[in-house]
Amino acid sequence: MDLPINLTSFSLSTPSTLEPNRSLDTEALRTSQSFLSAFRVLVLTLLGFLAAATFTWNLLVLATILRVRTFHRVPHNLVASMAISDVLVAVLVMPLSLVHELSGRRWQLGRRLCQLWIACDVLCCTASIWNVTAIALDRYWSITRHLEYTLRARKRVSNVMILLTWALSAVISLAPLLFGWGETYSELSEECQVSREPSYTVFSTVGAFYLPLCVVLFVYWKIYKAAKFRMGSRKTNSVSPIPEAVEVKDASQHPQMVFTVRHATVTFQTEGDTWREQKEQRAALMVGILIGVFVLCWFPFFVTELISPLCSWDIPALWKSIFLWLGYSNSFFNPLIYTAFNRSYSSAFKVFFSKQQ
């Protein structure tokens, strides 16, 4: 005989076994959300500090150049141009980009402000990149052609490079607005980004990054070759010490004359040459680090910026933000690298702060 099933006890026991699992899942979800919120706040705070530090450091460089008379000449005008572009990145670009991140990469500030932000972004970042290129070219010519590259020629060339830098940056940034070259704002999806038109993508990425990248890599290769040639020529102009004596006889004219040379060293290097070589080595090292940091900061962004529209490939929003802010950070590193390898700036900073007190 079949036993009756206790439906009441069954129905009461089932929820009791599921309730702890639900509470555990809810608690884990809350913990995960609170952790992500705390992490997001930390990241956004760090980005805010990055923008403030970029503004402060570049403004300090600009103020020093303006206050110290000895800096009113090349190559400090190139450094001033770079500092201006990096200050503008910190003032006009980073704050709105931070607002964009706070709103989950949704643009809620309207079409006009979107167009202005994108134009400033492209203008300032492109100018910063080309200013790095101009400094690298100036260092290359001063190292390899220091006799021809006189102060007058250097001033003229640097002014032309500054003019071309800002003119090219303006053309690249304003092209979508002036010629209707793609759309930067989408009201439906609340997106604000650089025009995804394939032809503009090629034009802007080549003009803003790939062309200056080729220039700086070529420049550093030439600087490296010049430094290697200098080291080789210095070795050929010296006689190293030898462990044993060497006798040289001239049997044709003076059979009785014997010259003995022991542990001899002959060099044809003056103190001025040594000082110049040390200065050139510091300049070459500075240019190398400046170029290396520039490539590390901007290469991931511009690779994805070129591939994404051409291949219809949407990268995750998180990686877009990482690559974009990594590029912005180059504006923070530029003045640090340049002033670290220029002793005159450290003394100028001391004079500047002493006057403020």
From Swiss-Prot:
Protein name as it appears in the record: 5-hydroxytryptamine receptor 5A
Binding, serotonin: 121
Record GO terms (molecular function): G protein-coupled serotonin receptor activity; Gi/o-coupled serotonin receptor activity; neurotransmitter receptor activity; serotonin receptor activity
GO cellular component, one term: plasma membrane
Extracellular topology ranges: 1-36, 104-114, 177-198, 313-314
Lineage of producing organism: Eukaryota, Metazoa, Chordata, Craniata, Vertebrata
Protein family according to the UniProt entry: Belongs to the G-protein coupled receptor 1 family.
Protein topology in the membrane: Multi-pass membrane protein
A Pfam entry, by short name: 7tm_1
Keywords from the UniProt entry: Cell membrane, Disulfide bond, G-protein coupled receptor, Glycoprotein, Membrane, Receptor, Transducer, Transmembrane, Transmembrane helix
Membrane topology, Cytoplasmic segments: 64-76, 138-155, 221-287, 340-357
Glycan attachment sites: 6, 21
Disulphide bond pairs: 114-192
InterPro entries in alphabetical order: 5HT5A_rcpt, 5HT_rcpt, GPCR_Rhodpsn, GPCR_Rhodpsn_7TM
UniProt-annotated location(s): Cell membrane
SUPFAM superfamilies recorded: Family A G protein-coupled receptor-like
Gene that encodes it: Htr5a
Tissue-wise expression: Central nervous system.
